[in-house]
Amino acid sequence: MLAPYPAILSEAEGSFGMSHRERSKRPEGDPSTAVGMTVRSTVTYYALKRVNYCATLYNRRTGFWIPSNMAHFQRIGLLASLDVPEVRDSLNKLEAFLLSQGREVVYEERAAKLVDWPVDKILPLDQFPGAVDLGIVVGGDGSMLSASRSMAASKIPLLGINRGRLGFLTDISPDEIAERVLPVLSGDYKQTNRFILETSITRHGKLIGEGLAVNDIVLHPGQSVRMMAFELYVDGEFVYSQRSDGLIVATPTGSTAYALSAGGPLLCPELDAMVVVPLNPHTLN
């Protein structure tokens, strides 16, 4: 799916980390207090912790969300990042429809640059909590993933209008905005739960990176074309040591993305599990 996924974890550059549950045992020397999965590569520790964020809701006729207990949505925030005519057209159409239904509409800063909208109705993303009941993302799956990661802690629901290619997560057609969005505004949706990976990287006892991932985390040597050696621990228990091109750790949501391309299995989105897929392993001990 689109950037910033998959996150690249490089021993040389150390960008992002990973996620799981709490653990009672750690690999010797592991400074991490997170539980779940640890990947150890020389002096670098990549810790993964499963976060109990509910990650999705589905409209009964399908749509992608981060859950909420609200049955009705009055204040709607519009998000978009792709500066293409199709996105601008859908934003204008969506805005007109929401206003016709008596909803209050605000634009996230990047989306506001694509349309003519009053300055007092523009909000940065970090001010959405408490200001909007529902976020609607116009774009592709990557736009939805980015918004989901940014807004996960706030639990603001997200609905996707597809202006990308695949539309796994943003599967409402621009031609069906009125037909598909109106039932959601009235509370006609079904909630499903998905989790997110919380990630951190520690080197020489110092935290050097952390983040969230809806799809997957990838351990990779970066731009260098070489194999890397590492050990994998789950809940503090040694699983294996490996030399390979890297490792993918994916959520069930992300099992349809990079992990699938690397030969991993497809998981039911609601399954409480993770996919671990080695990239071209040379050894597995």
How would you label these PLM feature ranges?
Residues 87-88, 142-148, 255-261:
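Short glycine/serine/threonine-rich phosphate/pyrophosphate-binding segments
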Residues 151-161, 168:
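Gly/Ser-rich helix-loop-strand patches that form or flank binding pockets
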Residues 237-285:
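Gly/Ser/Thr-rich active-site loops/lids in small-molecule metabolic enzymes
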Residues 43-46, 50, 55, 62:
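N-terminal, intrinsically disordered charge-dense segments
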Residues 166-245:
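Catalytic core of DAGKc-family lipid kinases
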Residues 104, 155-157, 275:
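Proline-centered loop/turn at the N-terminus of a beta-strand
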Residues 12-30, 36-37, 49, 56:
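A cross-taxon signal for low-complexity, glycine/charged-rich
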Residues 53, 65-134, 175-190, 201-211:
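ATP/NTP phosphate-donor binding region
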